């Protein structure tokens, strides 16, 4: 392939990705006008770039990549080798908690904007999106992140209290949970998925970083969340803690139980004809790639896991009851341990 043909191929792929992400929400004319304004060129010149009659410069590629949140390196003919390019945050010490939350919000917003999307979440623990809709649970998870994972110095000598987390963070967390409520999602859990939160709560109490009453209150809220998720699995539709059904797709919640495979919080996202994989890295972060061969491979793997799992949403009332009875039993056992602890 000549350099010129390769550049045409890459440029077409970039604009196709932008169009796929926009879906029906942006007309071709609107995209041309947006591109013309971004590159400071005429609409005719923008059309010529879209039709690949004029090549993009490196400066224009950078502007388009930043503005439309697309990565052009994934389109550079990677199929000719076995290499996969992953995007990974290496400057984590300079990443603020605001940036961390906004990154989750932005990625999720881009995914659900497309009418043809789906998320497959192979859950090592209960997906964080669920926690964020209950303020007390969101506050604890955020405190845990900032103290234990981000290791923020100002949290070194603090014990957990519900009022330590700012309203700004809780409000953004709520928005993230509302976005996820609109997503067409497939979650793969196992019996270990619920243990993580219980273990974190007990550890904080045993380490003197949380009062007993607070730990028990958190477990009560966790039971409340599990009751909500059980209801969602029953109706296969995400709903808020108050029972209101948000905007979204009917049958947009699919829950699977796999008793053998230990998951790792890997996420596969399909957005129209494009896809993205999120691979866990450094405890809290994700490496991402949109490499088609890799994404197709992961999609096939996760599809295979779901086929070998028990679907506990929808009509599977017996299996659903067995699983959630186990969950509530583990929560009560933890509360009993806390109640008699010194």
Please place each PLM-identified region on the residue numbering.
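Short, charged low-complexity intrinsically disordered segments located at boundaries
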Residues: 44-49, 77-78, 92-98, 134-140, ...
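Helix-turn-helix/homeodomain-like alpha-helical modules used for DNA recognition
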Residues: 80-158
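Hydrophobic protein-protein interaction segments
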Residues: 145-330
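Long, charge-rich alpha-helical interaction segments
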Residues: 330, 334-342
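Charged, low-complexity, helix/coiled-coil-prone segments
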Residues: 2-12, 40-47, 134-141, 155-172
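Basic, Lys/Arg-rich alpha-helical nucleic-acid-recognition elements, primarily the DNA-binding modules
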Residues: 1-89
């Amino acid at each position: 392939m000549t350099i010129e043909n390769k550049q045409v191929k890459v440029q077409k792929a970039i604009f196709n990705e932008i169009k796929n992400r926009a879906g029906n929400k942006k007309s071709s004319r609107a995209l041309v006008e947006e591109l013309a304004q971004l590159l400071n060129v005429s609409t005719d010149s923008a059309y010529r770039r879209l039709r690949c009659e004029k090549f993009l410069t490196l400066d224009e590629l950078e502007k388009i990549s930043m503005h439309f949140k697309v990565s052009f390196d994934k389109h550079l003919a990677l199929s000719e080798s076995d290499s996969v390019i992953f995007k990974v945050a290496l400057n984590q010490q300079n990443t603020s908690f605001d940036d961390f939350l906004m990154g989750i919000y932005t990625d999720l917003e881009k995914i659900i904007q497309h009418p043809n999307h789906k998320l497959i979440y192979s859950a090592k623990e209960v997906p964080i999106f669920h926690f964020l809709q209950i303020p007390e649970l969101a506050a604890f998870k955020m405190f845990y992140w900032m103290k234990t994972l981000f290791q923020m110095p100002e949290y070194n000598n603090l014990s957990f209290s519900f009022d330590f987390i700012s309203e700004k963070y809780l409000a953004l967390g709520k928005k993230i949970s509302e976005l996820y409520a609109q997503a067409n999602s497939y979650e793969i859990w196992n019996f270990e998925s619920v243990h993580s939160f219980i273990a974190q709560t007990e550890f904080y109490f045993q380490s003197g970083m949380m009062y007993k009453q607070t730990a028990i209150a958190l477990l009560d809220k966790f039971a409340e969340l599990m009751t909500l998720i059980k209801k969602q699995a029953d109706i296969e539709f995400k709903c808020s803690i108050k029972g209101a059904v948000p905007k979204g797709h009917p049958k947009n919640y699919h829950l699977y139980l796999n008793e053998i495979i230990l998951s790792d919080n890997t996420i596969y996202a399909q957005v129209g004809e494009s896809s993205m994989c999120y691979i866990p890295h450094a405890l809290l972060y994700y490496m991402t790639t949109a490499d088609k061969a890799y994404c197709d491979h992961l999609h096939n793997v996760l599809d295979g896991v779901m086929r070998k799992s028990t679907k506990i949403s929808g009509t599977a009332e017996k299996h659903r009851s067995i699983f959630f009875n186990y969950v509530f039993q583990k929560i009560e056992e933890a509360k009993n341990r806390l109640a008699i602890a010194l």
